[in-house]
Structure formats: structure tokens, C-alpha cells
Amino acid sequence: MLPLLLFVGSIVAPASVAAADSRPNILFCIMDDASYMHMSAYGCEWTDTPSFDRLANEGILFQNAYTPNAKCAPSRSSILTGRNSWQLEEAANHIVNFPAKFRTFPEVLRANGYQTGKTGKGWGPGLPGEIDGKPRVLIAKNYGSENLDKKPTTGMSNEDYAGNFEVFLEEIDSEEPWFFWYGSKEPHRRYEYGSGQKLGGKSIDDIKEVPGFWPDSEVIRNDMLDYGLEIEHADSHLGIMIESLEERGLLENTLIVMTSDNGMPFPRGKAQEYEYSNHMPLAMMWPKGIRNPGRTVTDMVSFVDFAPTFLDVAGIRFEDSGMQPSPGQSLMDVFRSRKIGQVNPKRDYVVIGKERHDYSRPGNQGYPIRGIVGNDYLYLYNYKIDLWPAGNPELGYLDVDGSPTKTEILELFRSGKDRSYWELSFGKRKAHEEFFDLANDPECLNNLADDERLTEVKHKMKARLDATLAEQKDPRFLGNGDVFDKYGFSQGHAWNFYENYMAGKESKKRTGWVDDSDYEPEPLD
């Protein structure tokens, strides 16, 4: 482990709210772009995450937690509202104006006596809207006064997340409950190349196997280690926060949650809908509230479950909260159970999907997908396979962040040496349906949609997905999905960016999250 990483509108409170001195504090920790399998608690051998592991060892390690949408803003929208992307109007998309009609759970906690604060990344990118002429506070007042003496690497933030949490604890009334959002900006790109070996003390040989959808090279192994170092940085700040809670005697009645918003910022990860995209790390610790700590739970958990859970532990009835209805379920039954493995047999699937992420397609189009995960299978339906799933090549595949891994795959493709990795990460889908056996193919490389032996299983999952989307009135499923492409962006230049760029009216300077070399010189279709 890198040593502390070098430094480190109101509503009426319902009658059911518990007495203030018994309501737990909540510390919600969310990384930026980390996949499920890269916490050491899950067996990763090239990252060390002792703080996450402590939550797992003294609380619950969730094996099957999923974000409904593997991109920053829409994923965080689901967390805040308890609703799936297709239930959130503009907030289904990335870089948007947050709809006024959707109350967030921190707003509800605040209205019911909770003191709230945040540090680091909250909801975004996008604009929260206004209340009484002032920016709406979707999460909480930001605590950002404390900074590290030196950035650990050129790619990391210099924010002292743990220091800002300490400032929050010093300011609040210790007799009243609180909610704090710790939004690490790591492991979001960009990384300092080679930092994983140089500062993290790791070797590229520590990585036993590179995912099959990337070439195995020294460059890519270094890219993975650099990503792992940033995960460790996020974890180290959580460790300091836990120590502070212990010193203050607050740990016993604090629910601590650690997860990530979406998968790793690599090709075929973040912004897609595969295991490396949507399957999230999740551990929770609450000494006073979780029975039989040290359990591993296999229930299917969705990010839409967070809001109902947090209101439940705070003694607030969801139906009295003023929030829009949620398909999520409180996890209090899991906390109160002593069971290992599957706790609630009804919690056996989650639904996922995506609409528009970044702005690299004609007509402001997204790449719509809906899917369902359960019983070790993943079913996906790609609505528009004539579109480029990672964004148009002539605009740099904007849905995939620039990186050494992306560059290497593009170079292999352009040189004619190997196009297979490009097809997996950037090529157009060959069929509307994708179906994967996750137990035997967690990398989602072998599409079994046409395997007759699994036809019945696939049809059952598709039927369950369709029934869920119909019940939730998904515009895409009901035939009005183009509404998602008509919603505006919170950044004016993004509207019709494709057309404006192709006409020479916009430049690559607007797309700093990719490399200039990611752009193909001409359209590929």
C-alpha cells in the first residue's frame, strides 16, 4: 500500500423519524471509475485496499452490486434519486441540467434534521438548477479548504479529502446525526504513466492476467497499475476517516459505505454495459446496525437501493419523503439478517441501460441499451446497432477516455496488425442481442445469444426485462426513446457538436478527455 498515499426546499419531518440520538450517521464514499474486481477484498493481487477490506471484514461485502448506467452523471443521478436512468428524463444522460422534479435523498435527510457535507466530486458533470435564485444543493455544502502539500502524482487531485472530513466533524453539532459524501476524484483519468510501479511499489508481473479484450503488453500493464495506485489513494483517505471516527467515539453508530460510480476508464469498461462497466465494488460497515459482521452477501443490489436504504436507516418513510417513487429496496433486511450468501430470494436480478453519454454522434444521439443481470447471466439489447457504441471514429470515440490502452488498440487497428481488440471496444455491434454466461465468461467475450441450448434462459430474462421496463414506463421500451436525444446539454457547445466539428466550427479542444490522436482522419462507414 502507498503510505497514506504520500499524505494524505424543506418538507415536514414525518412522525416516524427516530429520536436524534439514535439515528446513525452515514459516511458515503464513492470512487470515480473503479471496477468491482479491483479491490483486494475481491482477490485482486495488484491493489491493496485495507480500508475497503476493513468494511468488508467488519461489515458486509456485496458480491453483486451494479450501477444502472456506467457513466458518472447518470450513475450518480440514480444514487441520489433511487430511480433508474430511463425514469429520470434529462438525468438519464451525461452533461445535463438536473430536473427540478426529482428530490434527492440528501435533501430529504437535511430536511429531517441531518447535518450534511461533502468533499471531492459530487454529482456531475452538469448543472443542478436553482432554488430561489441560488444553485440547488443536490448533495450538501462542499468542504474543500484542505489540500495536500503536494499532489501525490501529476494525475491526482491535491484535495485532502480526509482533512475536509475533519473540518466537517469539527463544525457540526456532535449531538445530531450527519450525512457526509466523500467523492474521491480517483481513479478518474488522467494518470501519471509509470506511477504504479514508481510510487506504488508494484511490478507489472503482479498482474497475473490482462483482460482478454486488450492486448497484453508492458504499456497496458503499466496503465493498469497506474489505475490501481489511484484506487489505493482513494482507499487511504477512507482509512484516515475511519480512524477519526474511532477517536471521536462515532464509529459504532456510523454506517460507512464504499463503492464507485462506474467501471474503469478503459476501452470496454466505463460507458459500456458489460461486467467491467456496471459491476461495482460495494462494502458496508455499521457496528451497531449490521448483524453477524464479516459476511459476504450475493443478493443482486442496484444503486437505486441506496436512497431507500439511507432513508430507512434514518427512520424516514420513503413515501413521506417527497421523492419520486423508487423501484429500489432498502437493504435493512440484509443488515438485520445473519445469513451469508443470498439473504432475500426476491432480490435476484438488476436492470441496467444507457442513453446518451458524450457528444460524438450525429443528431445528438446516444447509444441506447437495456439489459438485465441475474443468475450468472447478462442479457443486453442494443437498440441501434447502426450507430457506433463508443462514439463516431472521426470524433475520437468520445465515450472512451483517452489512455495508453486506447492508443495501443487504435495503433494495432490502424497498422493492420490486429483489429480484433478494436472490434471489441470500438466496432459496431453485430446483433441487437448479447447474452453472456458470467460464471464462465466474466469478460463478456463469447456472445451466446444464438446458442439454442440457452434459448429458454435468454427468453425468460428478456421477458423479465421487458416487464420491468414496461412497469417503469421506460420511453425507449415504449417506442418514444428518441426523447432522450432531444434533451439539451448543460454545456451549450455540446449541442450539435458532431455537425459543428465536421463543418469546422468546433475543435478538438472541446474534447480534452480524449487524445487528439484518437480522432480518425475520416469516417469509417
Segments from the language model and where they lie:
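Formylglycine-dependent sulfatase
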Residues: 5-10, 16-428, 433, 442-463, ...
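Short, charged, surface-exposed hinge/linker loops at domain edges
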Residues: 477-491
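Extracellular, beta-strand-rich glycan-interacting domains
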Residues: 438-440
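C-terminal structured "cap/appendage" subdomains that terminate the fold
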Residues: 467, 471, 475-480
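Universal eukaryotic N-terminal targeting presequences
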Residues: 1-2
